[in-house]
Protein backbone atom coordinates (compact mmCIF):
# COMPACT_ATOMS: atom_id res chain seq x y z
CA UNK A 1 0.00 0.00 0.00
CA UNK A 2 1.37 3.39 -1.01
CA UNK A 3 1.22 6.45 1.27
CA UNK A 4 -1.39 9.05 0.40
CA UNK A 5 0.40 12.31 -0.37
CA UNK A 6 -1.96 15.16 -1.00
CA UNK A 7 -0.39 17.71 -3.33
CA UNK A 8 -2.07 21.04 -3.82
CA UNK A 9 -1.90 23.20 -6.96
CA UNK A 10 -2.93 26.83 -6.58
CA UNK A 11 -3.00 29.82 -8.95
CA UNK A 12 -2.42 33.37 -7.69
CA UNK A 13 -1.88 36.71 -9.40
CA UNK A 14 0.90 37.66 -6.98
CA UNK A 15 3.08 35.48 -4.76
CA UNK A 16 5.28 37.12 -2.12
CA UNK A 17 8.13 35.12 -0.62
CA UNK A 18 9.14 36.46 2.80
CA UNK A 19 7.45 38.00 5.81
CA UNK A 20 9.76 40.79 6.87
CA UNK A 21 9.03 44.50 6.48
CA UNK A 22 9.55 44.36 2.69
CA UNK A 23 7.31 41.32 2.24
CA UNK A 24 4.48 42.76 4.31
CA UNK A 25 4.78 46.15 2.60
CA UNK A 26 4.69 44.47 -0.81
CA UNK A 27 1.59 42.64 0.36
CA UNK A 28 -0.10 45.86 1.45
CA UNK A 29 0.52 47.62 -1.86
CA UNK A 30 -0.31 44.64 -4.09
CA UNK A 31 -3.50 44.02 -2.14
CA UNK A 32 -4.52 47.65 -2.60
CA UNK A 33 -3.89 47.16 -6.33
CA UNK A 34 -6.37 44.24 -6.20
CA UNK A 35 -3.72 41.62 -7.03
CA UNK A 36 -4.92 39.39 -4.17
CA UNK A 37 -1.42 38.47 -2.98
CA UNK A 38 -0.45 35.26 -1.24
CA UNK A 39 2.47 35.70 1.16
CA UNK A 40 4.54 32.66 2.14
CA UNK A 41 5.94 33.44 5.59
CA UNK A 42 9.17 31.41 5.54
CA UNK A 43 11.41 30.43 8.43
CA UNK A 44 11.52 33.59 10.56
CA UNK A 45 8.09 35.20 10.47
CA UNK A 46 8.57 38.95 10.73
CA UNK A 47 12.21 38.88 9.68
CA UNK A 48 15.19 40.27 11.56
CA UNK A 49 13.14 43.12 12.96
CA UNK A 50 11.53 40.63 15.38
CA UNK A 51 14.86 40.23 17.18
CA UNK A 52 15.64 43.95 17.31
CA UNK A 53 15.12 45.48 20.75
CA UNK A 54 15.08 49.15 19.85
CA UNK A 55 14.21 50.75 16.53
CA UNK A 56 14.61 54.49 16.02
CA UNK A 57 13.78 56.64 13.00
CA UNK A 58 11.07 54.33 11.69
CA UNK A 59 8.14 56.14 10.02
CA UNK A 60 5.11 56.30 12.29
CA UNK A 61 7.09 55.73 15.49
CA UNK A 62 8.54 59.14 16.43
CA UNK A 63 9.49 57.93 19.92
CA UNK A 64 10.95 54.67 18.62
CA UNK A 65 9.66 51.20 19.37
CA UNK A 66 10.73 47.59 19.56
CA UNK A 67 11.08 45.51 16.43
CA UNK A 68 8.42 42.95 17.43
CA UNK A 69 5.84 45.72 18.04
CA UNK A 70 6.54 47.32 14.66
CA UNK A 71 6.34 43.97 12.87
CA UNK A 72 3.06 43.09 14.59
CA UNK A 73 1.60 46.43 13.47
CA UNK A 74 2.78 45.97 9.87
CA UNK A 75 1.48 42.37 9.80
CA UNK A 76 -1.89 43.47 11.18
CA UNK A 77 -2.14 46.18 8.51
CA UNK A 78 -1.37 43.61 5.81
CA UNK A 79 -4.07 41.30 7.17
CA UNK A 80 -6.49 44.22 7.37
CA UNK A 81 -6.11 45.01 3.66
CA UNK A 82 -6.61 41.37 2.69
CA UNK A 83 -3.17 39.82 2.29
CA UNK A 84 -3.47 36.04 2.50
CA UNK A 85 -0.65 34.57 4.57
CA UNK A 86 0.49 31.00 4.72
CA UNK A 87 3.22 29.27 6.70
CA UNK A 88 5.81 27.35 4.75
CA UNK A 89 9.13 27.57 2.96
CA UNK A 90 9.45 28.10 -0.77
CA UNK A 91 11.84 25.34 -1.77
CA UNK A 92 11.96 25.81 -5.55
CA UNK A 93 11.04 28.47 -8.11
CA UNK A 94 10.98 28.12 -11.89
CA UNK A 95 11.39 31.53 -13.51
CA UNK A 96 12.14 30.07 -16.97
CA UNK A 97 8.64 30.74 -18.35
CA UNK A 98 5.44 32.53 -17.44
CA UNK A 99 3.44 31.99 -15.38
CA UNK A 100 6.04 31.18 -12.75
CA UNK A 101 5.94 27.91 -10.82
CA UNK A 102 6.88 27.76 -7.14
CA UNK A 103 6.90 24.87 -4.70
CA UNK A 104 6.24 25.21 -0.98
CA UNK A 105 7.69 22.64 1.42
CA UNK A 106 8.73 20.47 -1.57
CA UNK A 107 5.14 19.50 -2.34
CA UNK A 108 2.51 22.19 -2.89
CA UNK A 109 2.80 23.95 -6.26
CA UNK A 110 1.81 27.57 -6.73
CA UNK A 111 1.48 29.10 -10.19
CA UNK A 112 1.85 32.89 -10.12
CA UNK A 113 1.77 35.70 -12.65
CA UNK A 114 4.10 37.74 -10.44
CA UNK A 115 6.62 36.67 -7.79
CA UNK A 116 8.11 39.15 -5.34
CA UNK A 117 11.19 37.83 -3.54
CA UNK A 118 11.50 39.58 -0.18
CA UNK A 119 13.60 37.06 1.73
CA UNK A 120 15.65 39.66 3.57
CA UNK A 121 19.10 39.08 4.95
CA UNK A 122 20.72 37.02 7.64
CA UNK A 123 22.92 38.45 10.36
CA UNK A 124 26.52 37.28 10.33
CA UNK A 125 28.00 37.94 13.75
CA UNK A 126 31.68 38.90 13.96
CA UNK A 127 32.32 37.03 17.20
CA UNK A 128 33.87 40.05 18.93
CA UNK A 129 33.59 40.43 22.70
CA UNK A 130 30.83 42.76 23.90
What are these regions (language model features)?
Residues 36-42, 49:
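Short beta-strand "acidic-cap" motif of Rossmann-like dinucleotide-binding folds
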Residues 47-50, 125:
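Short acidic/His/Gly/Ser-rich catalytic and metal-binding motifs that mark active-site loops
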Residues 27, 31:
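Gly/Ala-rich phosphate-binding loop of Rossmann-like dinucleotide-binding domains
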Residues 20:
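Glycine-rich NAD(P) Rossmann-fold beta1-alpha1 loop
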Residues 50-109:
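N-terminal Rossmann-like dinucleotide/flavin-binding domain of flavoprotein oxidoreductases
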Residues 43-45, 122:
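Short glycine-enriched loops at secondary-structure junctions
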Residues 1-17, 32-33, 38, 85-130:
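FAD-binding core/adjacent interface of flavoenzyme oxidoreductases
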